[in-house]
Regions:
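Residue-level recognition of tetratricopeptide repeat
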Residues: 33, 67, 110, 144, ...
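Flexible helix-coil transition and linker loops at the boundaries of alpha-helical arrays
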Residues: 25-28, 97-108
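Short coil turns that delineate tetratricopeptide repeat
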Residues: 65, 99, 142, 175-176, ...
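Alpha-helical segment of the N-proximal tetratricopeptide repeat
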Residues: 24-63, 79-83, 113-125, 129
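TPR alpha-solenoid repeat register
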Residues: 70, 104-106, 113, 147, ...
Length: 315
């Protein structure tokens, strides 16, 4: 059995022990020796003495197997090294040892680990193994958007196109987010189903009326389908809500250009360029506030996963 599959199997055992109600392993939270060792580990880590920090974290876990910060420290080292099997194993232990209030965030980290294991399997051209890891990621955190996207991609790569589409459609019913809808739009476009493309974004806009990125995506679909009147109406409505959006003015300029209204097109393009021309709806990291031109699975600045959300595309 490969290490990644062994890790996948062990999650059930780890979660079963947690659910069974067994007492948590000793954490050393009030032990003077544990506190002093943790202080030294932190100092070593901050000073760049990584091997010393690892040794101290391992000592803590030998004496106090439920020491949460030692588990986090070794997990972070594993992530930095790209050792996702080790990271997942440590995260399973951390999920067991963590207090109830911390379990949601620890579940998110477990999802990250399985997601990265799945990506490794895809890179090895083994989509079936990747599917198992992505499903494990979603069992850990059902709201983990990168896992939903990647699960569908892996199913497609494995030849199960129908299940891939069902995976994305089920997720879109409750979480109509732009990257997810883009996957479905691609499918419907390939199948020459423009009505489904329009219905997809209309339903999403009705479900989340405050998400301006969805409204812009509906306008873009109208534009690409040559429904210029509908596209113009959609972007003019958006202009009222976000008058300084370069996305809105870029599309209005393109609409006027298609209509042959050269002067109006020039005016809109000029506004778009002044504001920062872009046809893609920008995103912002919920953790550190960094903006990105499009959605990404991981923030380029703080390196957190699943934190980018649509933002108002203004200066």
């Amino acid at each position: 059995m490969t290490p990644s599959l062994s890790t996948l199997v062990s999650v059930g055992r780890s979660l079963a022990r947690w659910v069974s109600g067994r007492p948590a392993p000793p954490s050393g939270s009030d032990d003077p020796q544990a506190l002093d060792t943790l202080r030294r580990a932190r100092e070593a880590r901050e000073a760049g003495r990584d091997e010393e920090a690892r040794t101290l974290y391992r000592f803590l876990l030998q004496r106090w197997p439920g020491h949460a910060e030692a588990l986090r420290g070794l997990r972070d080292f594993a992530i930095e090294a790209g050792d996702w099997d080790d990271a997942v194993g440590l995260q399973q232990r951390l999920l067991t040892a963590a207090p109830p209030a911390d379990r949601p965030i620890e579940s998110e980290w477990l999802a990250v680990g399985y997601y990265e294991l799945g990506r490794l399997e895809l890179a090895r051209a083994d989509p079936s193994a990747a599917v198992a890891h992505f499903r494990a990621a979603l069992r850990a955190d059902r709201e983990f958007l990168p896992g939903v996207l990647a699960l569908g991609d892996a199913l497609e790569a494995a030849g199960d196109h129908r299940e891939a589409v069902r995976t994305w459609e089920r997720a879109a019913e409750t979480r109509p987010m732009l990257p997810l809808l883009a996957r479905l739009e691609r499918v419907y476009r390939r199948e020459h189903r423009p009505g489904r493309m329009i219905a997809l974004y209309r339903a999403a806009c009705e479900r989340v009326p405050d998400d301006l990125g969805l409204a812009a995506a509906l306008g873009r679909v109208y534009f690409e389908l040559e429904m210029l009147d509908e596209a113009a109406e959609q972007f003019e409505k958006l202009e009222v809500r976000v008058p300084d959006s370069p996305v809105v003015h870029a599309f209005l300029g393109a609409i006027f250009e298609r209509r042959g209204q050269t002067r109006d097109a020039f005016d809109e393009y000029r506004r778009a360029l002044r504001l920062g021309h872009a046809f893609d709806w920008p995103h912002r990291c919920a953790a550190c506030g960094t903006t990105a031109p499009t959605w990404q699975d991981r923030c380029a600045q703080c390196h957190r996963w699943n934190t980018l959300r649509p933002s108002s595309p203004t200066r």
